[in-house]
A protein has these predicted regions:
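Flexible, solvent-exposed loop segments that connect beta-strands
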Residues: 23, 30-41, 62, 67-89, ...
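Positively charged n-region of N-terminal signal peptides that target proteins for export
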Residues: 1-4, 20
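Short, positively charged, low-complexity/disordered linker segments
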Residues: 123-152
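Sec/Tat signal peptide C-region and signal peptidase I cleavage site
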Residues: 15-19
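Sec-dependent N-terminal signal peptides
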Residues: 4-13
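Hydrophobic secondary-structure block in the mid-to-C-terminal portion of proteins
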Residues: 145-182
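Gram-negative (and chloroplast) outer-membrane scaffold detector with strong preference
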Residues: 45-122, 144-150, 179-182
Length: 182
């Protein structure tokens, strides 16, 4: 009986050693980008959700992220106002390297995936288009743990969004959010 208890204990301890930690982060923030064929910067907002797996609670995490970015800009050309509105739905793999203690971590992350985009230009004539393309970039941020399993997140991300038939460009985001570790 003692032997069985010892074996069970050793198996449970070894399972803990190879276990993984999971994190979910929901964030939102301010986004900005230079819109091609205009002289103004598009500004707007972003919401984002990330599910991350952290093998053996180490410093490397692997995540899947999905978000929505909404940008708009207006300019006057030849006495008419042209309003550009862009929406983007990026879906990407988000590897992360974390440094720090159990209460405070800083991180560097990547982004590699695709995005589905909507473009709308309004003036005397309204033009609408949709497209699909590459989404990739990187960022950095911090995590402050309020409890062992709850943290607040702040980060900056810059990503290249390309499209097959119309506009490409850099999109920057400054965001904050809340996360849960389980």
């Amino acid at each position: 009986m003692k032997k069985n208890i010892l074996i069970t204990f050793l198996i449970l301890v070894s399972m803990k050693a190879i276990s993984q930690e999971n994190m979910v982060t929901i964030s939102g923030g301010y986004s900005f980008a230079n819109i091609e064929d205009t002289d103004v910067k598009g500004t707007g907002w972003r919401i984002n959700g990330v599910y991350e797996m952290n093998p053996m609670a180490g410093k490397f995490a692997h995540g899947i992220a999905i978000g929505y970015i909404n940008l708009s800009a207006s300019e006057t050309i030849a006495q008419q106002t042209v309003t550009s509105t862009i929406g983007s739905l990026p879906v990407y793999y988000a590897p992360k390297v974390m440094f720090g203690s159990d209460k405070f971590k800083i991180f560097v992350k990547g982004a590699l995936g695709f995005q589905y985009a909507w473009l709308k230009r309004e003036a005397l004539v309204t033009i609408k288009d949709t497209d699909f393309g590459f989404y990739g970039g990187g960022g950095a941020g911090l995590m402050i743990f309020l409890k062992e399993n709850i943290f607040i997140n702040g980060e900056y991300e810059i990503a290249w969004a390309s499209n097959s038939s119309y506009k490409d460009g850099w999109i920057s985001t400054v965001s904050g959010g809340i996360g849960f570790k389980f």
